[in-house]
Amino acid sequence: MQKLAVYVYIYLFMQILVHPVALDGSSQPTENAEKDGLCNACTWRQNTKSSRIEAIKIQILSKLRLEQAPNISRDVIKQLLPKAPPLQELIDQYDVQRDDSSDGSLEDDDYHATTETIITMPTESDFLVQMEGKPKCCFFKFSSKIQYNKVVKAQLWIYLRQVQKPTTVFVQILRLIKPMKDGTRYTGIRSLKLDMNPGTGIWQSIDVKTVLQNWLKQPESNLGIEIKAFDENGRDLAVTFPGPGEDGLNPFLEVRVTDTPKRSRRDFGLDCDEHSTESRCCRYPLTVDFEAFGWDWIIAPKRYKANYCSGECEFVFLQKYPHTHLVHQANPRGSAGPCCTPTKMSPINMLYFNGKEQIIYGKIPAMVVDRCGCS
């Protein structure tokens, strides 16, 4: 008898959910009730969207290991941002994110960002300051991220000023060392000869992978480098300390590292738009605009599609999520019930300034909601 009563109760409960009964006794919902339901759903989604945006801001800072957003103005960024081929390629050909069914899951992502490319601008070391006859550039301080990854490429980029007629340019890169007994302070890294034609200046890249690897193994040996580039008349063409009109032409190091890709799983779920009347757990579109935050330190993307999850995980809908339903039935008091949450997420690539005014190109995991489900 008790079992029969339970079944009757469940049946009536399901009927109420599917066909709500108005208080006046009519079997059809009133027009006001429908409007109220839609308004409540819109309000709930708006609150979920706002919470998602705030969570994204916190996650980005945390995953990039930043205590706060770097305080870099647009004017400073204009001065620091190299006008160089590798950076332009990253910006022009930027793959903001992909919104497809490619494999990837929340569980398989690491928490912190994965670094792929680091662009390091020169600074001045104490050793360079103490030297007599200030050398022509440059000391590079390396991010700790480089030391924990496999370096696959390291190039020094220098800008050579324009020439008035066809000429041969002699480029020499020297590594500073502690003074020898004979007074020697340099050892050669690379020498090359270039033929330049009249017109605009050019960017020239030089492989310094071996030097970088030695510096990483023995940080105390990193005392800086000197850059020389003279034409046939002895005119210095290398931009080492940019003058007027030479913003963005500083020498810099482009370092690329690699990480082992992780295996992933496939998942499925509902997709909805902002005008959808779907009440079940569903994925909704959400575009995050970094410029609206005032986050100028993010070079690219300026915005990206983050998406968010919203909707109900009621008993009558649990046939779509049978595993979660069975777990809940086995231990009904173990939780407050299933919630609509991301079940599959993918990373975004990001080009940004860190707190040390270094330009980092990396991958931030779990920033795009690809699938939603009840769990």
Curated annotation (Swiss-Prot):
The keyword Disulfide bond applies. InterPro entries: Cystine-knot_cytokine, TGF-b_C, TGF-b_propeptide, TGF-beta-rel, TGFb_CS. GO terms for molecular function: cytokine activity; growth factor activity; heparin binding; protein homodimerization activity; protein serine/threonine kinase activator activity. The keyword Metal-binding does not apply. Glycans are attached at residue 71. Disulfide bonds join 272-282, 281-340, 309-372, 313-374. Keywords: Cleavage on pair of basic residues, Cytokine, Disulfide bond, Glycoprotein, Growth factor, Secreted, Signal. It is found in: Secreted. Acts specifically as a negative regulator of skeletal muscle growth. PANTHER family: GROWTH_DIFFERENTIATION FACTOR 8 (PTHR11848:SF150), TGF-BETA FAMILY (PTHR11848). Homodimer; disulfide-linked. This is Growth/differentiation factor 8. It comes from Meleagris gallopavo. The lineage of its organism: Eukaryota, Metazoa, Chordata, Craniata, Vertebrata. The gene is MSTN.
